[in-house]
Swiss-Prot record:
Domain of life from the UniProt record: Archaea
Mutagenesis / variant outcome for changing R107A: 45% reconstituted RNase P activity
Subcellular location: Cytoplasm
Keywords recorded for this protein, A-Z: Cytoplasm, Endonuclease, Hydrolase, Nuclease, tRNA processing
Protein name as annotated: Ribonuclease P protein component 3
Pfam families the record matches: RNase_P_p30
Organism: Pyrococcus horikoshii (strain ATCC 700860 / DSM 12428 / JCM 9974 / NBRC 100139 / OT-3)
Amino acid sequence: MVGGGGVKFIEMDIRDKEAYELAKEWFDEVVVSIKFNEEVDKEKLREARKEYGKVAILLSNPKPSLVRDTVQKFKSYLIYVESNDLRVIRYSIEKGVDAIISPWVNRKDPGIDHVLAKLMVKKNVALGFSLRPLLYSNPYERANLLRFMMKAWKLVEKYKVRRFLTSSAQEKWDVRYPRDLISLGVVIGMEIPQAKASISMYPEIILKRLKY
């Protein structure tokens, strides 16, 4: 086992075939996210599941209606929402998507607050802390992103929100070792055991919902 000691390390958000092949070497399990901006393509999902096994629907800046329809029609897939629109973030949490990923990107705040954190706990919605935005930002942007991630982590820790650390790799060069994701967790305020749990225990809890 990659994680060792019976621990499975899980990469929850890989967005590219070559990235998947590399991540498979470094993680015990890998979830491939298929990105949709508008209507979800059933055939594309079926092909992805056949090829990769564990698949998530990634709704990028969706309208609330797309979130609603996806949650209703695709319960056997993980559903992630990536948006900086608070209205969409709240609606997605209320509808019970599996995860909100990096809501602080292109915002001037963490994208969640105490109210949303409590709602995430109630609806079993996880918060995904993605490394990728940090890789493609200038020093000023990176400092702000880290500041918002630290604030989000404090809310996650306080209210015991489900969480995971991920590379969100869109090409193989974005994939990172488990230890790198653990280091990201430490940088934003996690203790090492908390960071390890964010690529092992919490992803396992999230994956239990899948109905293949």
